[in-house]
């Protein structure tokens, strides 16, 4: 499951849809203040993923987060305040991934709802990556753990 809060750039949203489909995500939840998924640039940049991957626009991502946690879904927030690197987390069970606005990240409330806050370690003077790039890194770590670690073990 992918949660997207207040994504504003149509190209980012389109890339997030394509990446989510390629990584086997089964549903995307969008906050109401996310760019229109049917805007021409989003539709073009999804390369059709918009029409194959189930998604919904949610009024209240926070209550949805609480319901998922009650259903024993691990909820991971990508947040600069995270204390654990994304590759140190276990994505073996049911998981939801929270990604926030390009400039401001996740709201404090949604970030605090997460089971665990993660970060992508950075070298040099870079503080963060583009939201679509970050999602790609984390989703493919989940794919690696689920597919390849099981096969090796």
Question: What residues fall within each predicted segment?
Answer:
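Post-transcriptional modification and biogenesis factors for structured RNAs
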Residues: 1-153
